[in-house]
């Protein structure tokens, strides 16, 4: 019942008092004034209520799992998330990124979640055989129909499409193309040392390393285990050439053969010219050693460009420069980051919309310039790719460029083989037993095919 207004209370009290007086004396009542009239009914109505505020639309969400937490890559991811939110305002993005170069830590966390049946709504994997185990274990959905409805098949290079197609089906959406076979340096350091230019072969690098050591500097800055694996693939590529390098992953090149033995000898010598005993914690600190002049070179993929021009605010070909790693001119050792749709995703529809963002021209053109990569799509806006990225895009789309896949970044090796190789590499780095390493890798290859 509504609470009476003050005027109503006064009227009620007056009426009650009059009644009591009339019982005591009728004569007195007849001479008294008339009781106060009740206020009009309109005055007794309940005050009008303000209209209830309109309800906000119910929020959905999508959990996006990646390892993009470093400078450049984090900004790129955030740019793509912002674009996604502008197109899907009722979907919150849960950024579940886990720190660690090349996804070393993130992959361990992800595998635990997949084993427990608790997948994120979409997760990052490298395109290629890295995803093969998840496909075999029935952890991810077939996205072929999504490719057809979005018209993506006509927008991706054939080589990339082949790399992400397994038994005629496609299971991930690539957002970019990276190049692994690069060596980075600063022009001012080379000039100060009297070195005309970066080495074109690993033999030339070793010759330069002697001069560099004599000047009190380290020839090559190196990072943790995964960066050493990355270095191994570039030495193997430079020493064996693209065809025999590819043969290591399809069985046509013998790991225990003389050519591989010679390449591993070179790799051993390259390690001797590096700061392996005081290896940096990750690739960014290794790059910093080159910037401050403690080391002359570092071998790393082109995500380093995003770090140097973004976080470090440096200018390409003035403050830093890059070229194909020794022996690999004209070759593009590629890798690609891609996203999946796990089976059992809690927010499947939102996850599918995230994949559409990943595969869109706008999403890729926002992400890649900051990440330090080129778009997976062939119809991206080339004007957005300047400096090093303009060179990378030109090389990637050049029909004369020879394309090979990365070992360290999941294109050519499944997870089991890659893990066994990495274990053997860790032993080799300590023992320097090249023959033992080759035998262990050959055995692992045969066992994990």
Where are these regions (language model features)?
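Extracytoplasmic/periplasmic substrate-binding proteins
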Residues: 67, 265-347, 353
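Bacterial lipoprotein signal-peptidase II cleavage site
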Residues: 26-38
């Amino acid at each position: 019942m509504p609470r009476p207004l003050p005027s109503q209370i006064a009227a009620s009290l007056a009426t009650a008092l009059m009644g009591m007086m009339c019982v005591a004396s009728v004569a007195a009542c007849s001479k008294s004034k008339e009781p106060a009239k009740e206020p009009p009914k309109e005055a007794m109505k309940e005050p009008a209520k303000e209209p209830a505020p309109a309800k906000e639309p119910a929020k959905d969400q999508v959990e996006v799992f990646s390892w993009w937490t470093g400078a450049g890559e984090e900004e790129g991811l955030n740019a793509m998330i912002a674009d996604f939110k502008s197109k899907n305002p009722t979907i919150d993005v849960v950024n579940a990124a886990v720190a660690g170069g090349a996804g070393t830590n993130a992959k361990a966390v992800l595998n635990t979640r997949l084993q427990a049946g608790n997948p994120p709504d979409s997760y990052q994997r490298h395109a290629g055989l890295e995803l093969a185990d998840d496909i075999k274990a029935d952890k991810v959905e077939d996205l072929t129909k999504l490719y057809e409805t979005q018209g993506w098949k006509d927008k991706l290079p054939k080589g990339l499409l082949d790399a992400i197609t397994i038994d005629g089906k496609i299971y991930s959406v690539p957002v970019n193309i990276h190049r692994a076979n690069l060596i980075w340096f600063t022009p001012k350091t080379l000039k100060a040392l009297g070195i005309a230019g970066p080495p074109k072969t690993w033999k030339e690098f070793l010759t330069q390393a002697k001069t560099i050591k004599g000047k009190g500097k380290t020839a090559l800055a190196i990072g943790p285990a995964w960066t050493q694996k990355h270095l191994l693939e570039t030495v193997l590529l430079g020493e064996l050439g693209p065809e025999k390098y590819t043969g290591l992953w399809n069985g046509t090149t013998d790991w225990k053969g003389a050519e591989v033995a010679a390449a591993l000898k070179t790799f051993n010598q390259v390690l001797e010219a590096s700061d392996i005993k005081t290896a940096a914690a990750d690739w960014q600190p290794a790059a910093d050693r080159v910037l401050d002049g403690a080391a002359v070179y570092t071998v790393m993929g082109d995500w380093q460009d995003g770090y140097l021009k973004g976080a470090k605010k440096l200018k390409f070909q003035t403050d830093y420069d890059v070229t194909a790693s020794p022996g690999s001119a004209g070759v593009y050792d590629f890798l690609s980051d891609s996203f999946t749709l796990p089976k059992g995703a809690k927010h499947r529809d939102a996850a599918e919309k995230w994949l559409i963002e990943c595969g869109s021209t706008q999403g890729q053109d926002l992400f890649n310039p900051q990440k330090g990569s080129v778009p997976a799509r062939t119809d991206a806006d080339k004007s957005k790719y300047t400096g090093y990225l303009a060179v990378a895009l030109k090389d990637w789309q050049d029909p004369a460029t020879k394309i090979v896949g990365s070992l360290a970044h999941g294109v050519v090796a499944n997870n089991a083989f890659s893990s066994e190789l990495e274990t053997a590499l860790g032993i080799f780095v300590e023992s320097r037993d090249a023959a033992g390493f080759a035998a262990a890798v050959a055995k692992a290859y045969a066992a994990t095919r």
